[in-house]
């Protein structure tokens, strides 16, 4: 009986680990303040293109505006993304471009949504 229970416990651990969405090596996991989803923020700032690769390396994807900001109203201003008001004082990239040279970014403490140039290395990757 003990062997059967031990085998079931091992199987459960393997299944639980394999169902996990990805890793967060070189980053910090956090929960969305509104939706409770798990995100991974890089420990290093990087440009927009590098953010895609960093998330892919984690087995995840660079989060879109819809994944970051529930019920976004299309406006770029303060407090439009309460889901990202998580006290990590940093700007983060979204996967959404805005025009030819810009991408949407979100401040992880104020919930402010703005745009930044693709090449700027002052924002962090946030993966979903």
Where are these regions (language model features)?
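Sec/Tat signal peptide C-region and signal peptidase I cleavage site
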Residues: 15-21
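Residue-level detector of bioactive/disordered segments in secreted/extracellular proteins
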Residues: 13-15, 26, 42, 57, ...
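Extracellular adhesion/carbohydrate-recognition regions
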Residues: 21-61, 100-102
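Intrinsically disordered, low-complexity segments enriched in glycine/proline and serine/threonine
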Residues: 5-6, 20, 70
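An exposed tryptophan-centered "aromatic clamp" motif
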Residues: 49-59, 65-119, 126-128
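Sec-dependent N-terminal signal peptides
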Residues: 4-13
